[in-house]
Amino acid sequence: MSKRDNLYLVGLMGAGKTTVGRLLAKHYGCTFYDSDHEIEARTGVKIPVIFEIEGEAGFRRREEAVIAELTTLSGIVLATGGGAVLSPANREHLRTNGLVIYLRGSPEQLCERTRNDRNRPLLQTGNPLAKLRELYQQRDPIYRELADVTVDTARQSVAGMTRVLYGKLDLLKGEATSFDPAG
């Protein structure tokens, strides 16, 4: 399997990984997966329930297993959970088996996008913005180190982000003739 067969989206919650991932999959004729949705489908419960019963560590174990499995596939676009990059094993799977795209948004922007979303256990706190700032400070260096491509989501529409991504991916395609997300 070529490193260029798959596209993996990373970034904090609310960055647009699922939305942009679906568009990339459609554009390139790939199958789309969302690691959080896969976990929910396999367990039959929502992510907050897993956090409540198993804690974050239990959820991360499930996430690691799903990512290990999905990264063996070819011709996919995968939207990962925001904390997936905390696992060295996940980082290795992503780095080795595809192109990693970091959708980078400011904590303030992401807080605005997620303010009414109750399906994000880490933000069910008295100060979600402070939590997002903490997560950004912790994870941004990891995302940047892992990413082959970074797109700033600030003040960009989804259409604008995807246009930027298509351009960047087309440039990579020119540099690496093996790039073919559709397999």
From Swiss-Prot:
InterPro entries: P-loop_NTPase, Shikimate/glucono_kinase, Shikimate_kinase/TSH1, Shikimate_kinase_CS. Its EC number is 2.7.1.71. The keyword Nucleotide-binding applies. It is an enzyme of class 2 (transferase). The keyword Repeat does not apply. GO terms for biological process: amino acid biosynthetic process; aromatic amino acid family biosynthetic process; chorismate biosynthetic process. GO terms for molecular function: ATP binding; magnesium ion binding; shikimate kinase activity. Monomer. Catalyzes the specific phosphorylation of the 3-hydroxyl group of shikimic acid using ATP as a cosubstrate. This is Shikimate kinase.
